Amino acid sequence: MNLVLPGQVVARGAPNGEGTVKRGDYIISTRTGIFDPEKNSVTYPRKVEETAVLPNVGSIVLARVSRINARQATVNISVVDDVCTKDEFQGVIHVQDIRATEKNKVKVQNSFRPGDIVRALVISLGDGSSYFLTTARNDLGVIFAQSSETGEQMFPVDYQHMQTKSGYTEMRKCAKPILDE
């Protein structure tokens, strides 16, 4: 059994179970949890009561976007280097840290929305209240989102668009899917 993240391919060519969706031939996790290959399902991990994991510079984190404005997205970090944390930590993704290229054209509202699950890299311990994060790599960005219009789950179709099964498309800074084969 392995820890899996939302948007991660967990199996191929089998029926999907709880906490997963089928996309073509792939089974994709819809939540952070433990993958059970016998049931093709993802269950929620129990938070370890004495987890002392803290984000460090270079840590890969999973976070939920809590609010956005023109300059930054504020997130709540709940997973650090594949370990669920007991408490959430606050993080900030500044507009200049969203993409590696075309930094002057990036708009926070076209990259993230409240409720999105984001994979990010800790670049600084921040200002005492928030960790500073970046999504300026191909493997970093939104990994799970729901449409703000329809409420449906969305999947990445390219590096800057996510789409629902019904075809509705929204802009996001999408993370490249992690394919375990």
UniProtKB/Swiss-Prot annotation:
Compartments reported by the entry: Nucleus, Nucleolus; Cytoplasm
Domain S1 motif: 58-137
Single GO MF annotation: RNA binding
InterPro entries per the UniProt record, alphabetical: Csl4, EXOSC1_C, NA-bd_OB-fold, S1_domain
GO cellular component: chromatin; cytoplasm; cytoplasmic exosome (RNase complex); cytosol; exosome (RNase complex); nuclear exosome (RNase complex); nucleolus; nucleus
Keyword check for Lipoprotein: no
Keywords of the record: Cytoplasm, Exosome, Nucleus, RNA-binding, rRNA processing
Keyword Nucleus applies: yes
GO biological process: exonucleolytic trimming to generate mature 3'-end of 5.8S rRNA from tricistronic rRNA transcript (SSU-rRNA, 5.8S rRNA, LSU-rRNA); nonfunctional rRNA decay; nuclear mRNA surveillance; nuclear polyadenylation-dependent mRNA catabolic process; nuclear polyadenylation-dependent rRNA catabolic process; nuclear-transcribed mRNA catabolic process, 3'-5' exonucleolytic nonsense-mediated decay; nuclear-transcribed mRNA catabolic process, non-stop decay; TRAMP-dependent tRNA surveillance pathway
Source organism, top-level taxon: Eukaryota
Chief localisation class: nucleus
Subunit structure, interactors included: Component of the RNA exosome complex. Specifically part of the catalytically inactive RNA exosome core complex (Exo-9) which may associate with the catalytic subunits rrp6 and dis3 in cytoplasmic- and nuclear-specific RNA exosome complex forms. Exo-9 is formed by a hexameric base ring of RNase PH domain-containing subunits and a cap ring consisting of csl4, rrp4 and rrp40.
Protein function: Non-catalytic component of the RNA exosome complex which has 3'->5' exoribonuclease activity and participates in a multitude of cellular RNA processing and degradation events. In the nucleus, the RNA exosome complex is involved in proper maturation of stable RNA species such as rRNA, snRNA and snoRNA, in the elimination of RNA processing by-products and non-coding 'pervasive' transcripts, such as antisense RNA species and cryptic unstable transcripts (CUTs), and of mRNAs with processing defects, thereby limiting or excluding their export to the cytoplasm.
Family affiliation: Belongs to the CSL4 family.
Protein name (database record): Exosome complex component csl4
Species the sequence originates in: Schizosaccharomyces pombe (strain 972 / ATCC 24843)
Lineage: Eukaryota, Fungi, Dikarya, Ascomycota, Taphrinomycotina
